[in-house]
Amino acid sequence: MRKILVIVVTYNGMKWIDRCLGSVYASGMPADVIVIDNGSSDGTPEYVGKHFPEAVLISTGENHGFGKANNIGFSYALEKGYDYVYLLNQDAWIFPDTFSRLVDAMEKNPDYGVISPVQMAASMERPDPRFAVKCLDRPLAEYVAGNVYEAPFVMAAHWMISRRCLETVGGFSPAFRHYGEDDNW
């Protein structure tokens, strides 16, 4: 069984965190979770500590931004020997088979460093507009469920990263506080 670490960076994410973390723990494939809280003032870290005590919680005390906070999680993943890291935005969630499908795709394609599911809008009726513009080069209906497609860019809201890739590329540049880290990576 491959070891997966899910990194969730939070900042005042109370309205989303229950669904986000709940979806991870309802996954059909076990994963550990580290929550890096960027100085929330809405009770997010306290809620995580009380309702998701199995998650590792690191409170930075201030907003370091997406990249720097994820780098804390990257270091933890490498130190603890995880095979895969999954970046999950605080306002996002996964389906029960997300990890098993992505790990299967990574195992069948060991040259892949990063893989992502199609990122849907909250309505689940269409892809997230930012994902569609940057990642899809044809109408969604032309993609076959279960297949893997190369994309020029994938937003880091849902990234599964292999350990090998993380060791090769390293973390995000601290020059990017919020947005652009994934494009630069």
Go through each PLM region and give its residues.
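Short, acidic, metal-binding catalytic loop of nucleotide-sugar glycosyltransferases
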Residues: G22-A31
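Conserved donor NDP-sugar-binding/catalytic core segment of glycosyltransferases
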Residues: F95-P129
